[in-house]
Amino acid sequence: MGLLLILVGIGGGLGAMSRFALTQATASISKQIPIGILLCNIIGSLIIGMMAAFLIQTKLFNEDISTYVRSLFVTGFLGGFTTFSSFSLDILNLLQRGEALLAISYILVSVIVSLIAVILGFYFIMGIYR
């Protein structure tokens, strides 16, 4: 457990630094659309899909090594880079199980409730500082 936490921490730090670097590098492209975050979400989703398929399809990783790879890259790096990638993988898993209605519901609830949470959190703090 200790080594896994260290791997998650290292990966998370690298992912967060990568997200910061990408958002800074793309900040001048558009002031209206957060291009950097959009790219992080898309790139993170691409990487998590590739990692999931790679870990499933190859015999290079046994269960123990796979746990370390997931901890460093998926939970750590991609968790620091974006959490949207995990959300996207969850949706893919639902679709692969033939649960399209549940996947659509999950998308709608996640996006709507997350947006509501952001709005509530924003206005709660704004109210404190009035």
Swiss-Prot record:
Annotated membrane topology: Multi-pass membrane protein
UniProt record similarity statement: Belongs to the fluoride channel Fluc/FEX (TC 1.A.43) family.
Regions crossing the membrane: 2-22, 35-55, 72-92, 107-127
GO biological process assignments: cellular detoxification of fluoride
GO molecular function terms listed in the Swiss-Prot or TrEMBL record: fluoride channel activity; metal ion binding
Lineage: Bacteria, Pseudomonadati, Pseudomonadota, Gammaproteobacteria, Thiotrichales
Alphabetical keyword list: Cell inner membrane, Cell membrane, Ion channel, Ion transport, Membrane, Metal-binding, Sodium, Transmembrane, Transmembrane helix, Transport
Reaction(s) the record says it catalyses: fluoride(in) = fluoride(out)
Protein name as catalogued: Fluoride-specific ion channel FluC
Main location group: membrane
Record organism: Francisella philomiragia subsp. philomiragia (strain ATCC 25017 / CCUG 19701 / FSC 153 / O#319-036)
Functional note: Fluoride-specific ion channel. Important for reducing fluoride concentration in the cell, thus reducing its toxicity.
